[in-house]
Amino acid sequence: MAEEQESALQLPPSTAPEAEVPTEVSPETATPEPPSSAAVSPGTEEPVGDTKKKIDILLKAVGDTPIMKTKKWAVERTRTIQGLFDFIKKFLKLVASEQLFIYVNQSFAPSPDQEVGTLYECFGSDGKLVLHYCKSQAWG
Amino acid sequence: MEENEFFGEKTFQHYCAEFIKHSQKIGDGWEWRASKDCSDGYMCKTHFQVKNGTAVSHQGTSDHVQTFLPVEEALDPPLDDLEVNETTTAAEVIKYEYHVLYSCSYQVPVLYFRASFLDGRPLALKDIWEGVHECYKMRLLQGPWDTITQQEHPILGQPFFVLHPCKTSEFMTPVLKNSQKINRNVNYITSWLSMVGPAVGLNLPLSYATAASQDEGNVDGQDSSIERKSLEEH
């Protein structure tokens, strides 16, 4: 899946770790701007360079899951996986019958109360935490 | 449907063995139980949880006021070792049992579970729902009887709740395919349990995530350097 380009909305250009080609709109779904949510911040209220407060998360879709237009987010360390669930579900407009899974290491689903800061410490590299997400009908 | 996400009982047992190795390292309490004729078996874990009360004063580190003990601390202690704060009289201790069995018909692992009070009274399914994490409640509540059924444990012959396995291969496939792309060996059991466990109150410590990829072994570097050396000497 060609999903490597992202727009780092919240990163000041000078600190963007990868100087990549500007946003390539994903062909599959054109998702609208996220609802303003307290879960993650695309905003510029604090520089992401201040790694004490926020960490970079890169979201990658697995399987047939819609790709988020914005994949890179600055997230507070104390935000939980549960919080990310809520955020991604809203962003992708998932219905209640659809289950979302988020993975570290591409294969392990951390428990919902796990904080992303901890995940970053354990699984982050190159200044970011890569999380894969997948929607599915897990039940029934 | 591709064959990758299905496996035989031997493979199931292998993944369970690897999983249990790690569990033993971190004291997570999983063990293997073989059936009487040892032809098959299952993996199981028991943990205790305080319901509707304050946290169990267990080594003084738990600050969870909610219903779950952190899994890392929920070792499988004999009851008399479990330090329950005597003043929390309103609290009840619940014993949860989780069993991982292999389903021949679906060719995937299946999670069996049950809960009871210490006096042996079983918990009803509706009580178990209270322990389901918020993020799963929405979906599971829509059709709980589609997803959790009560069945006889194939080896113990006792009633357990079962997380229905019919969709397992469907949600495991993308994960496995994705990992295969990058040539990573995934412990199916670890991955699967991390996904379904939280729905029934079972959380896996993070260290399992890195344990799985360590199992691949790092023989290459050492062997080749040894070979090189011996060649040079000759």
Swiss-Prot record, chain A:
Bilayer disposition of the protein: Peripheral membrane protein
SUPFAM superfamilies listed in its UniProt record: Ubiquitin-like (SSF54236)
Pfam families, per the entry: APG12
GO CC, alphabetical: Atg12-Atg5-Atg16 complex; autophagosome membrane; phagophore assembly site membrane
Annotated region (Disordered), positions in chain: 1-52
Segments of skewed composition (Low complexity): 20-42
Keywords: Acetylation, Autophagy, Cytoplasm, Immunity, Innate immunity, Isopeptide bond, Membrane, Ubl conjugation pathway
Principal cellular location given in the protein's record: cytoplasm
Record-linked InterPro entries: Atg12, Ubiquitin-like_domsf
Gene Ontology molecular function, alphabetical: protein tag activity
PTM annotation: Acetylated by EP300.
Top-level taxon: Eukaryota
Record carries keyword NADP: no
Localization, UniProt: Cytoplasm; Preautophagosomal structure membrane
Position of the Glycyl lysine isopeptide (Gly-Lys) (interchain with K-? in acceptor protein) cross-link: 140
Domain remarks in the Swiss-Prot or TrEMBL record: Shares weak sequence similarity with ubiquitin family, but contains an 'ubiquitin superfold' and the C-terminal Gly is required for isopeptide linkage.
Family classification: Belongs to the ATG12 family.
PANTHER family: AUTOPHAGY PROTEIN 12, UBIQUITIN-LIKE PROTEIN ATG12
Quaternary state and interactors: Forms a conjugate with ATG5. Part of the minor complex composed of 4 sets of ATG12-ATG5 and ATG16L1 (400 kDa); this complex interacts with ATG3 leading to disruption of ATG7 interaction and promotion of ATG8-like proteins lipidation. Forms an 800-kDa complex composed of ATG12-ATG5 and ATG16L2. Interacts with DHX58/RIG-1, IFIH1/MDA5 and MAVS/IPS-1 in monomeric form as well as in ATG12-ATG5 conjugate. The interaction with MAVS is further enhanced upon vesicular stomatitis virus (VSV) infection.
Summary of the function given for this chain in its UniProt record: Ubiquitin-like protein involved in autophagy vesicles formation. Conjugation with ATG5 through a ubiquitin-like conjugating system involving also ATG7 as an E1-like activating enzyme and ATG10 as an E2-like conjugating enzyme, is essential for its function. The ATG12-ATG5 conjugate acts as an E3-like enzyme which is required for lipidation of ATG8 family proteins and their association to the vesicle membranes. The ATG12-ATG5 conjugate also negatively regulates the innate antiviral immune response by blocking the type I IFN production pathway through direct association with RARRES3 and MAVS.
Name of the protein: Ubiquitin-like protein ATG12
Organismal lineage: Eukaryota, Metazoa, Chordata, Craniata, Vertebrata
Gene coding for it: ATG12
